[in-house]
Amino acid sequence: NGNASYNLKSNGVSIHTNASTSSYTFTQSNITSNQNYELEVLQGTTTITKKFSVIVNPGANTQAMPTNLVDGINYNSTDATKATLVLDAPLKDFVYVAGSFNNWQPTNAHAMLKDPTTGKFWLELTGLTSGSNYTYQYWVVDATPIAGTPAMVKTADPYSTLVLSPYDDPTIPAASYPNLPVYPTGQEREVTVLQTGQTPYAWSTATTNFVKPAK
């Protein structure tokens, strides 16, 4: 209770302040891109921060998906700077890909396209560095959700080969998983690890020359 100082930030930039008020309101209009807000409330020596986001519908994003793509990560065999993501999310309205490659602030450039035939969402990532680890997750939006369910769900790729978890990873000893990639600070829920230009696994001759024993 009582007066407090308010500082509202949008994508890390302060857009409105009020040095002393007991009830804070602010209206921002003409929002055309995704915004991550932080409201810092200072009262005496106590600071409370509230976070929330506004996700903009990118509109019609229909485009035929290239052939021979499968659900999950599709690595480009001839260009290690590219990878194509495919997500099957029936009845969802739109999907953004948020990741380390866009500082977890996806714009229209990372709004997934929707294949008109299969209804699957897909997006080609470009500008990747071969051998580097990237993390990402899908922001799946239902514009008219069922009562009691969220309009947006953040989820790792269901076909991930490596997932980082803010809940489980701290309990994994280095002896069990050496050099486990670090979960990205400030994110929510599980994320997928993507790496182009991986060195193919060297199978032993015992495996490649295995002969099935007779019954």
Tell what function each PLM region has:
Residues 33-37, 132-136:
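Exposed beta-strand face motif in extracellular beta-rich ectodomains
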Residues 57-80, 135-215:
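An acidic, Gly/Ser/Thr/Pro-rich helix-cap/linker signature
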